[in-house]
Swiss-Prot record:
Keywords, ordered alphabetically: Ribonucleoprotein, Ribosomal protein, RNA-binding, rRNA-binding
Region annotated Disordered, chain positions: 1-31
Functional description taken from the UniProt entry: Binds directly to 16S ribosomal RNA.
Pfam families with a match to the protein in the record: Ribosomal_S20p
Official protein name in the record: Small ribosomal subunit protein bS20
The encoding gene: rpsT
Source species: Chlamydia trachomatis serovar D (strain ATCC VR-885 / DSM 19411 / UW-3/Cx)
Length: 98
């Protein structure tokens, strides 16, 4: 048989699936870290509002904590139990101040 000629296709190079999994998992890890950081920041702002004792900022902070916890569950970053725990603890902190 005659030797095969190399094809002249120009396009994206194929990569092994294991390498692709590494790349996609790193992207997902960065996205998750960023979101978890956002959650921690909102929780810290809520704690500051509780310490200040301002009822309006406490209720706004509680709304934002509930919202971000539910978004984390929806995106698969938190499990439902963790989000429920976060919401329960923040509502406990808000009740004595309100």
């Amino acid at each position: 048989m005659a030797p095969r000629k190399p094809s002249k296709k120009v396009g994206p190079q194929k990569r092994p699936s294991a390498e692709k999994r590494v790349i996609t998992s790193k992207k997902k890890q960065l996205r998750n870290q960023s979101f978890k950081s956002k959650v921690r920041t909102i929780l810290k702002k809520f704690e500051l509002a509780v310490q200040s004792g301002d009822v309006e900022s406490i209720s706004a902070g509680l709304r934002s904590v509930y919202s971000i916890a539910d978004k984390a569950v929806k995106r698969g970053i938190f499990k439902k139990g963790k989000a429920d725990r976060v919401k329960s603890r923040t509502s406990e902190r808000a009740c004595p101040a309100a």
